[in-house]
Amino acid sequence: GASGLIAFPRV
């Protein structure tokens, strides 16, 4: 989760 950016899954 990066500030609610879908481009960033919880990796």
Curated annotation (Swiss-Prot):
Subcellular location: Secreted
Coiled coil: none
Keywords: Amidation, Neuropeptide, Secreted
Superkingdom in the source lineage: Eukaryota
Family annotation (Pfam families): Periviscerokin
GO annotation terms (biological process): neuropeptide signaling pathway
One annotated Gene Ontology cellular component of this protein: extracellular region
Main subcellular location of this protein, as a coarse class: secreted
Modified residues annotated as Valine amide in this record: V11
Family: Belongs to the periviscerokinin family.
Function: Mediates visceral muscle contractile activity (myotropic activity).
Name of the protein in question: Periviscerokinin-2
Protein's organism: Chroicoptera sp. (strain Windhoek)
